[in-house]
């Protein structure tokens, strides 16, 4: 209300009229306010229209404000190389990037729902009305600190002995990644009974460094820690590769095209 120089009552009336117009509630009236699924779709639609209006104004020689671009990106990419994408894009464009944080198995669905304009996913098939390109492969290994190895694995390091010690999962979606590693790399049945859940990318690495757990981590994220001997790959020859794809909605937007170019260039340098 303050931003629009309106009374709270006037804002409430505008929201009610909007909800009547679109045929459903657009927000959950809690503190803080949350958008409903319909509200999220409406917001994404407004952002897409803003991006198109920006492109049209530029083509017409009119002054154009930089419209936000909403995307969905997973934790491991955010923790490793996506900040470089932001830097490269910001050198050319002033468009704010609004990032929805979601697992790489979920980001494509978010794009399909219309909540974002682009995403990074482990699935390559484009969404309806969109395009996709392969970026490369994110590689994962199982790591632990020398302290952890001395405490729990001083007798032997085997798949069975490791899985009987404290491990780490980020959240419920991380189960899929660890399951793939256990089956494809270690040739064992999935087991999570000794795993803590700790949904923090920085904290994930810290827990492993502190000798609390073993952790399945992107090799990109812990190169320095491995080189300095603070983390040790438990099975150096066992590496899980996760393919990553960039998806985007087909829009006539130079800003989105520049973001796509930045993603491709940085991914080419970072991913194998």
How does the language model describe each region?
Residues 21-22, 42-63, 263:
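Alpha-helical linker/hinge and terminal dimerization helices associated
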Residues 17-37:
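A short LG(V/I)-centered, amphipathic sequence patch enriched
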Residues 234-272:
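A late-sequence structural motif
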Residues 163-188:
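Secondary-structure junction motif
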